[in-house]
Amino acid sequence: MEEDEVAESWEEAADSGEIDRRLEKKLKISQRENSKSKSPPKAPVVIQDDSLPSGPPPQIRILKRPTSNGLASNPNACSRPAAPVKSLAQREAEYAEARKRILGSASPEEEQEKPVADRPARINQAEEIRQPNNVIRQPLGPDGSQGFRQRR
């Protein structure tokens, strides 16, 4: 019945020693459970001695790579066929063809001259017309009063 009694406040419980008794009781219960669970391990622990031989060493297998088309694969050979070497003229022709297909022009020289002439005129004018920004401050109010300097 002692556990069923509830103190009005924790201060009363601390003064009467009730909190200490309950803590000691719970501590004894947990210590009993720990001592029961600390029984010796059921499985034996085997400690190997280095002086005794320790069975055969593990076997190591060296596996070979699978062969393709009956030939052993060469580490330097690629699985895809080697592309034929193209001359400079062939590469330039293919580049020009692709450029024409994508961009609409075959030579890069046309594109380099074009952006200079296409520059918008408005940007050029804005750089020349810019004036410095001067801020004009009026320390007095609009009606001649002190404005922000006025003390209340």
From Swiss-Prot:
It comes from the Eukaryota. Residues 42-107 form the SUZ domain. Residues 66-77 have a biased composition (Polar residues). Residues 111-152 form the SUZ-C domain. Residues 28-152 are annotated as: Disordered. Residues 89-100, 113-130 have a biased composition (Basic and acidic residues). Belongs to the SZRD1 family. This is SUZ RNA-binding domain-containing. It comes from Xenopus tropicalis. The lineage of its organism: Eukaryota, Metazoa, Chordata, Craniata, Vertebrata.
